């Protein structure tokens, strides 16, 4: 029994109860550049690694604004991601026109999941080969959802998708319990650190990552979804590197002091 007997059509089940075309779409998400999302009670942050197809080309956008209160980061087929981000933008505009209020983030993620699920039940369609991290703010606070090509969606405190995302997940799993009380600056630093884990030795700079944030200030005013300026990102990266180098410098200076003490010791009497 060969798999190719059951993977030519998205509506054909295998004897093991699997839809291979849907699984292939989920594998496409793992081939895209890494994206990270994390949230506190009041803010949500999205970060993405910028990967160019070749040295001669520029990178494609991975983070998109959907509305003032929400945005997405995507991994997989960027063209599919652009289509879905336009769909989400249209849903937010229609809801705001009818109800004069922003679309809750949970319903935004649900509508995206419903659209993806339809493609798993139509023989003339294919699943979207992209995974989306949906971050936003509503009356109940900040939210982060992951929407899968299968039509499933899950809410997370922190999550990572894309190539080598397991390294970022491991980093986030060690720290996510304190994220509810994090400041926006701390969230951005952890998002950048998680992206750095996926770069496999490549130096993290403001040119190879994108960061966006949305949240609510202490006085209750909403900070709209916005891309963080490249200059500010570089300043944060520089401060992170300085903080990492400080303990090493202290350890080196203390070891040198111990060596100096050893050379100044009086010789033993014979």
From Swiss-Prot:
Coding gene?
PAF1
> Which GO BP terms apply?
proteasome-mediated ubiquitin-dependent protein catabolic process
- Which residues lie within the region annotated Disordered? 239-270
The family line of this record is: Belongs to the peptidase T1A family.
The record's subunit annotation is:
The 26S proteasome consists of a 20S proteasome core and two 19S regulatory subunits. The 20S proteasome core is composed of 28 subunits that are arranged in four stacked rings, resulting in a barrel-shaped structure. The two end rings are each formed by seven alpha subunits, and the two central rings are each formed by seven beta subunits. The catalytic chamber with the active sites is on the inside of the barrel.
Which PANTHER family does this one have?
PROTEASOME SUBUNIT ALPHA/BETA
Q: What GO CC terms are in its UniProt record?
A: cytoplasm; nucleus; proteasome core complex, alpha-subunit complex
InterPro entries the record matches: Ntn_hydrolases_N (IPR029055), Proteasome_alpha (IPR050115), Proteasome_alpha-type (IPR023332), Proteasome_alpha1 (IPR035144), Proteasome_asu_N (IPR000426), Proteasome_sua/b (IPR001353)
Source domain of life: Eukaryota
Q: Name one Pfam family in it.
A: Proteasome_A_N
The major lineage groups are:
Eukaryota, Viridiplantae, Streptophyta, Embryophyta, Tracheophyta
Identification of the protein by name: Proteasome subunit alpha type-1
Q: Which UniProt keywords apply?
A: Cytoplasm, Nucleus, Proteasome
Q: What does this protein do?
A: The proteasome is a multicatalytic proteinase complex which is characterized by its ability to cleave peptides with Arg, Phe, Tyr, Leu, and Glu adjacent to the leaving group at neutral or slightly basic pH. The proteasome has an ATP-dependent proteolytic activity.
| The keyword Kinase is annotated on this UniProt entry | no
Instruction: Tell me which SMART domains the record gives.
Output: Proteasome_A_N
- Show the ranges annotated as biased composition (Low complexity): 245-256
The listed locations are: Cytoplasm; Nucleus
Main location class:
cytoplasm
Q: Does the keyword Cytoplasm apply?
A: yes
């Amino acid at each position: 029994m060969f798999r190719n007997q059951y993977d030519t059509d998205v509506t054909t089940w295998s004897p093991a109860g699997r839809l291979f075309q849907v699984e292939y779409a989920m594998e496409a998400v793992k081939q895209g550049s890494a994206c990270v999302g994390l949230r506190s009670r009041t803010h949500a942050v999205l970060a993405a690694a910028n990967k160019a197809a070749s040295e001669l080309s520029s990178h494609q956008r991975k983070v998109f604004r959907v509305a003032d209160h929400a945005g997405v980061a995507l991994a997989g087929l960027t063209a599919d991601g652009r289509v879905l981000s336009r769909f989400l933008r249209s849903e937010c505009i229609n809801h705001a026109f009818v109800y004069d209020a922003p679309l809750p983030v949970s319903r935004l993620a649900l509508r995206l999941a419903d659209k993806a699920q339809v493609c798993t039940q139509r023989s003339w369609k294919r699943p979207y080969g992209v995974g989306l991290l949906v971050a936003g703010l509503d009356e109940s606070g900040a939210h982060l959802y992951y929407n899968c090509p299968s039509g499933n969606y899950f809410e997370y405190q922190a999550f990572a998708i894309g190539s080598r995302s397991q390294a970022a997940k491991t980093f986030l799993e060690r720290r996510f319990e304190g994220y509810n009380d994090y400041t926006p600056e701390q969230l951005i630093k952890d998002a950048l650190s998680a992206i750095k884990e996926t770069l496999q030795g490549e130096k993290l700079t403001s040119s190879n990552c994108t960061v966006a944030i949305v949240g609510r200030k202490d006085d209750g005013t909403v900070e709209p979804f916005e891309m963080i300026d490249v200059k500010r990102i570089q300043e944060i990266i520089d401060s992170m590197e300085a903080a990492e180098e400080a303990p090493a410098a202290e350890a080196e200076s203390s070891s040198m002091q111990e060596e100096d003490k050893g050379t100044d010791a009086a010789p033993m009497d014979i």
